[in-house]
Amino acid sequence: MTILRDYKLSGRKAFAVLLDPDKVEQDAFSTLLQRTADYPVDFFLVGGSLVTDYAHKEVIATIRRYSSTPVILFPGNPLHIESSADAILLLSLISGRNADFLIGQHVIAAPLLKKSGLEILPTGYMVVDSGTQTTVSYISGTMPLPHDKPDVAACTALAGEMLGLQLMYLDAGSGARRPVSAAMIAAVRKAVNVPIIVGGGITSGEKAYEALKAGADMIVVGNGVEQDPDLLPQLATVVREFNQSVVQA
């Protein structure tokens, strides 16, 4: 989606909400979508590392009823392809060494993606240690990047960019005890020119601002925005004010 690159080139930042179909509670979900009229988000991501309900189509249909915001799939496996979305993050788990998540799943998904009409976003997916084991680390059988090793993350991202990946996604994971560090985001920002997405552990406006200032082009928050009524306006306001400061500068 060229809009992410446009955001980066302009210096503007994006805000995305990640919706896990397994964790969507319908009443809270509808309320969240209505609130985005006052506190806009730039993208909805739909998916998760382990989705058992496969309600992607229903979740996307509900989003469409309330919003024209673009929907991007965040797939855990080839079964999570849904053509009613706008685009899909084609995730290559470059922080790990499991060939199935580097290329194996992609071989299975490729013909389905070809037919889907979705915009394909080749993404270097880097799982970062957040103080607790995440679902993606367990399912993939891989170790996350050490929280305090920004140089390792930078070299990993650089290799991904050299391989042709068009986005980098630093993810501390659902339920993270701590977010990706500003030092790691800054190191990756210095190493690569592609847009950087950062998610996991962003539980306050202050943490969102730190990620944006360090070099994140898009921040992602999960279903926690449904549970904490104050989080959506906090994050939307931080991103809006950050972008306003860029324009004024």
Swiss-Prot record:
Keywords: Lipid biosynthesis, Lipid metabolism, Magnesium, Metal-binding, Phospholipid biosynthesis, Phospholipid metabolism, Transferase. It catalyses: sn-glycerol 1-phosphate + (2E,6E,10E)-geranylgeranyl diphosphate = sn-3-O-(geranylgeranyl)glycerol 1-phosphate + diphosphate. GO terms for molecular function: magnesium ion binding; phosphoglycerol geranylgeranyltransferase activity. The keyword rRNA processing does not apply. Pfam families: PcrB (PF01884). CDD domains: PcrB_like. Transmembrane segments: none annotated. Its cofactor is Mg(2+). It comes from the Bacteria. Sn-glycerol 1-phosphate binds at Y169, L170, D171, A172, G173, S174, G175, G200, G201, G222, N223. One of its GO terms (biological process) is glycerophospholipid biosynthetic process. Mg(2+) binds at D20, S49. Homohexamer. Belongs to the GGGP/HepGP synthase family. Group II subfamily. This is Geranylgeranylglyceryl phosphate synthase. It comes from Spirosoma linguale (strain ATCC 33905 / DSM 74 / LMG 10896 / Claus 1). The lineage of its organism: Bacteria, Pseudomonadati, Bacteroidota, Cytophagia, Cytophagales.
